[in-house]
């Protein structure tokens, strides 16, 4: 329910370089040219501690966990990225820590840039749900499956969803998943597929088919 038009406080977006869910928020940030309204701060993953850390202390905090504790006195939040927030009366005001919601919030901001922005349009919610559950989450379900049955189910759903996208692209007249207009479907799918060969194929065992077998998806990804 946050109204960006009525609130003039500087909005901040915390993201991690390696996080695909952060990547989708950064895509909207760039496409909408929101650098005047939203300040992006990148955090690094500390392998030793398993935490996200600031390159320089931010508001007295070195880690994301410390920042969450400082800003969620009345609410319980998991220390995850991305994170959209501002300050009210010098207090941290968390707007959202859910990437899909952040994408929608940022897309609602009117850019102050003089340059032309690219609009992100809505798409079929069932398609978006398929991308989110079976592809974005699906690669992790494959990689972290606790048994063979769970892995096979996740892999089957993953490649079934990719086949659905492949067929949809084959019927399209435009360059995007839903035709001639960029939609949330493109924003959601790209961060996963751009990481496919480097991460998901081998490390997460997403090997039922090669991504190169999906000719239309490869063309779309370019």
Listing of model-derived features with the role each one plays in the protein:
Residues 8-9, 51, 56, 148, ...:
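Domain-scale activation on soluble regions of proteins
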Residues 10-12, 37-40, 82-83, 91-94, ...:
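Beta-sheet entry/capping signal
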Residues 76-80, 94-98, 104-111, 115-222:
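GST-like fold's C-terminal all-alpha helical module
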Residues 53, 57-87:
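Structural micro-motif
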Residues 40-45, 78-87, 120-122:
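Short, glycine/charge-rich beta-strand/loop segments that flank catalytic centers
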Residues 15-20, 44, 68, 85-90, ...:
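Short, flexible loop/turn elements at secondary-structure junctions
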Residues 32-39, 70, 206-207, 221:
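Non-catalytic interaction surface on structured domains
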Residues 2-50:
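Local sequence-structure signature of Cys/Sec-based thiol-disulfide redox active-site neighborhoods
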